[in-house]
Amino acid sequence: MGKNKDVRITITLECTNCPQNKLKRYPGISRYTTQKNRRNTPNRLELKKFCPHCSLHTLHKEIKK
């Protein structure tokens, strides 16, 4: 009897500030990959992470793959 692996999924977090910000250090959009538990957090995940393109801590939201 193995564990059900479908509960924990891999998601991508994308910076919400990068598309609007014109004064970036270099072009591009910051993305992080992480895992979340579907039972504990059924809605979209939002975290404050460091964006190397904006050189700031910004809000990163979960995106669809």
Curated annotation (Swiss-Prot):
Domain of life: Eukaryota
Any single GO CC term annotated in Swiss-Prot or TrEMBL for this entry: ribonucleoprotein complex
Annotated compartments: Plastid, Chloroplast
Predominant place of localization: plastid
One Gene Ontology term of the molecular function aspect: structural constituent of ribosome
Family recorded in the similarity comment: Belongs to the bacterial ribosomal protein bL33 family.
Designated name of the protein: Large ribosomal subunit protein bL33c
Source organism of the structure: Staurastrum punctulatum
Name of the encoding gene: rpl33
